[in-house]
Amino acid sequence: MSDHRLALVLLIGLPRSGDAMTRLLLVRHGRTEMNEWMSKPGKGWGAPGFVDPALWDTRLTPTGEMQARELNSQMRSWHPEVDLLLASPLRRALATAEIGFEGVRCQTQRIEPLAAERCFLSSDVGSPITELQRSFSPAWGFETLPERWWFQGDELTPEWRPPGTYVNPGEDSKTFYARMARLIEALRACAGEHETVALVAHWGVLNALTGRSFKNCEWSDQLVSDLPDTPFVAPD
């Protein structure tokens, strides 16, 4: 190795061989019932007198389904084959993945609970595995998760959310970003086995992985080696 090359390696580190080769498609889910509700005047996150509407594990709206079909057209054209398709176990991500990647050749697909959204609101509380098994393809491998797989919280969980009325515990930043660090490692572990990995997830998750704000059904195409060593942290 030349002195110049050695200096670069010592300065920035040498990417893992799998990281440098594996493409990573990051996708945010389509528009949901909670997205619609939060867009109303005075209903947004942190609004005075905020009250959670108790929309549990929200589904895609007709607009969200249309966005997922548009995603499908793009995937069929630009990425007609994906080695591994991962999705958060929340309904909006699973539905986006099933619509958005229909007809795309996927060697393997599975749910990735590390990619669930940070538990802000009722919409981020998951559905029992037995319910998901009735609604989505068995190819996801739901049997690998416990019945109640989502963040539970307890009376010791500190409240970090803006003043308001909530119907579920909020996932504190320490817990969430520790989970995001494990997700980064899990994605890197996939790199040596697959050429293209797709992950369908959520705003908070994708922001932690990239530092960017993703719109509904927006996606990015990058390398696993582009992932940060530690998650990007957004202010509460």
Which positions does each model-derived feature cover?
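A short, acidic, amphipathic alpha-helical segment used as a generic capping/interface helix at domain edges
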Residues: F176-G192
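Bacterial N-terminal signal peptides that target proteins for export
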Residues: M1-L6
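A short, structured active-site edge motif that brings together acidic residues
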Residues: L84, P89, C106-V125, P146-W150
